[in-house]
A protein has these predicted regions:
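Substrate-binding cleft/loops of secretory-pathway carbohydrate-active enzymes
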Residues: 427, 451-479, 530, 534, ...
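Aromatic-lined carbohydrate-recognition surfaces of secreted/lumenal glycan-active proteins
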Residues: 435, 439-455, 575-580
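Active-site-adjacent substrate/metal-binding segments within catalytic domains
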Residues: 71-131, 195, 199-206, 261, ...
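Bacterial Sec-dependent N-terminal signal peptides
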Residues: 1-22
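Extended acidic/polar, glycine-enriched regions
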Residues: 146-150, 221-299
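Substrate-binding clefts and catalytic carboxylate motifs of secreted carbohydrate-active enzymes
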Residues: 29-55, 114, 184-187, 199-200, ...
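Accessory carbohydrate-binding/adhesion or oligomerization-edge regions at the termini
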Residues: 16-80, 156, 160-165, 170, ...
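Accessory beta-strand-rich segments of carbohydrate-active enzymes
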Residues: 25-30, 45-50, 83, 87-200, ...
Length: 617
């Protein structure tokens, strides 16, 4: 019997290895349950270029003719499709089998992200619709499935990156990649999974670290409230630090004292384990969730950003999260971790995550490794003066902040990038609404309305400047005691902006100017183009970057060190930086590493440049 059991396990291991699920790791490590099924792997699909699939009732499909590997987008090599042209309509299908022991539980279908609009059908019946290409969403499919049975799951996707109604980030609005715009991502691009949850189970929790009072505050939300209890335990490497029990309702607040508190920081990224158990009236444990928390505080005093009540200088790198074979999707969990390690090896203490909402497992590794991040949406491509666009974006941004607010590695919320809209009503209204909304969801972090753009509502002031001469950069950033401000442009407005948008055709619009009342950072600079290939001259002419490229490697190092030292020398006025960028991305070849993550430079020299902090004065 023992021999048979051993043989069975060996055969099972071989079978699993042969049919390995891509991205098989648990996708939500800060809210983890045991009863789950990963739906990544082989699906069938069909493009719907005529947009007639609904009319032809493709939602009733039991399988399409072509195969795709989920969670990789059809534009990517890893999907097995690699279709590069625009995809406005697309259909997916796979079967889902509901385990028998999931009876009497809610069956929840989770999508890490689907770009852009998606509709979910079970056995031909409409179950849900979602707007937003970078935010996660959950569908309760309990009414449509039965335990012990197999069902048809169909996902319909719509996307039009050229519509101006949906944020698209750095996706091309032309057929081919150009400048700082790259291959598009359509459809499913993050993990899809099912989980079984008791009807009284936890829907979410908000964790608020309070290092001043040495306590962790937890606010739960439940699917249903039927009079049970919530038990929360805080542990330090298996040892109980604090334990509290409250009523299992969404008005409860759990306050966990944290004696001998260990704070989270890049120097010591300590994480406490958090265990949450829902107990019904009969004393049965009906839901268990594993989580973690970092005790850290970020706030602003005057012109400086503080971490754990100490001024903290951020040496960030721009990370766009693109991969040669997966586009927006990392090929593996190890690749996510490796990107952070590469950045730290280069001397950075964090990253501005640029024009893409990174998946939860990236933040998990940032939390574990002690890596600072700024959370940003993929805002490019949308018309900020358009009311429908604003409606779409506000919904998506809400879901982004609610999902990621518990990660200690996130210091700043930045919904948009380089938005310059000469408008006195709609753009200011959008920025002010985003500010109020973000503060209501998460009052613990600074809000940064638009990176390097027109600052309407913000807690920090940022500029972008790609001047390649260090002396000129210093003059531009700080000349005769005056910091670089937003441009003063005279705008010739189109007649359609008359009246409702508050501007007349001949009005001059002046962008908001810095008032020296908040931290000031240069959160894009550098971007030095360098491609030391065998075809040097040809590569330098066809690749893309900022300014005239250096003529030699030594000239590159000298320019880089000069630019960084210039910014550091202004630390009394410029409190942090973000260098462009971590890796090359397609034709944009100004990364510290190549697109495949191999080193481009002598990393000891690079680390020596980027690991420097300003001199204490």
């Amino acid at each position: 019997m023992k021999r048979i059991t051993t043989l069975s396990f060996f055969m099972l291991f071989c079978w699993i290895t042969a049919f390995a699920i891509p991205r098989a790791e648990y996708p939500r490590p800060q809210f983890e349950r045991n009863a789950w099924i990963n739906l990544n792997g082989e699906w069938t699909y069909s493009f719907d270029f005529g947009g007639s699939g609904l009319e032809r009732e493709w939602f009733k499909s039991t399988g399409f003719d072509q195969k795709i590997t989920v969670p990789f987008c059809p534009e990517s090599k890893l999907s097995g499709v690699e279709y590069k042209d625009f995809i406005n309509h697309m259909w997916y299908h796979r079967t889902i089998s509901i385990p028998q022991d999931w009876a009497n539980k809610q069956v929840l279908l989770n999508f890490g992200a689907v770009y852009y609009k998606s509709e979910i059908y079970i056995d031909g019946v409409f179950a849900a619709r979602h707007f937003g290409g970078t935010s996660s969403f959950q569908v309760d499919i309990t009414p449509y499935v039965k335990a012990g049975q197999t069902h048809n799951l169909v996902v319909y996707v719509e996307s039009d990156v050229r519509s101006t109604h949906q944020p698209s980030g750095k996706q091309n609005l032309q057929f081919a990649s150009y400048g700082c715009n790259y291959t598009r991502t359509t459809g499913i691009w993050q993990t899809v999974w099912m989980e079984a949850v008791h009807p009284e189970g936890l829907q979410s929790v908000q964790m608020i670290p309070d290092i001043d009072q040495q306590q962790l505050i937890i606010r739960p939300r439940f699917y249903k409230e039927l009079g049970g209890k919530l038990e929360v335990t805080l542990k330090d490497n298996g040892k109980v630090v604090s334990k509290e029990t409250v009523a299992a309702n969404s008005l409860s607040t759990v306050i966990l004292p944290v004696k001998k508190m260990k704070t989270w920081s890049p120097e010591n990224p300590f994480l406490y384990d958090v265990e949450l158990r829902v107990i019904d009236k009969a004393g049965n444990v009906v839901d268990e969730v594993k989580s973690y928390a970092g005790m850290r505080k970020v706030h602003i005093e005057g012109k400086k950003i503080y971490l754990n009540n100490q001024p903290y200088y951020q040496r960030l790198v721009l990370d766009q999260g693109f991969y040669p074979d997966g586009i927006w999707t990392a090929p593996s969990d190890e690749a996510l971790k490796k990107d952070i390690q590469l950045s730290m090896e280069a001397g950075f203490n964090g990253a501005r995550l640029h024009q893409k909402v990174f998946e939860e497992r990236f933040y998990y590794w940032a939390d574990k490794l002690g890596y600072l991040t700024w959370g940003e949406a993929s805002s490019w491509g949308m018309d900020c003066n358009d009311i429908e666009t604003a409606r779409n974006f506000i919904t998506e941004w809400t879901e982004i902040v609610e999902r990621d607010r518990n990660h200690p590695s996130i210091l700043i919320w930045t919904p948009t990038n380089e938005e310059f809209w000469p408008d006195r009503v709609q753009y200011p209204r959008l920025m002010q609404d985003l500010y109020k909304l973000t503060k209501a969801i998460d009052p613990t972090r600074p809000f940064h309305g638009t990176s390097g753009g027109s600052h309407i509502a913000t807690d920090i002031w940022t500029v972008h400047n790609y001047e390649q001469d260090p002396a000129k950069l210093k003059e531009l950033l700080y000349n005769d005691g005056k910091l670089m401000e937003a441009p003063k442009w005279e705008i010739q407005l189109m007649p359609k902006n008359i009246g409702f948008n508050g501007l007349k055709y001949t009005d001059q619009y002046t962008f908001p100017q810095y008032k020296h009342d908040m931290p000031y950072l240069i959160d894009e600079f550098g971007g030095i183009k360098w491609n030391p290939s065998q075809q040097m001259e040809s590569a330098q002419n066809t690749s893309w970057g900022y300014g005239e490229p250096p003529h030699s490697l030594e000239e590159f190092y000298a320019r880089l060190e000069g630019l960084v030292n210039t910014v550091l020398s202004l630390s009394d006025h410029v409190w942090g930086y973000c260098y462009t960028q971590l890796t090359d991305v397609e034709q944009e070849q100004n990364g510290i590493y190549y697109y495949d993550r191999s080193p481009k430079f002598d990393m000891k020299r690079i680390h020596a440049i980027f690991s420097k902090n300003p001199e204490t004065k």
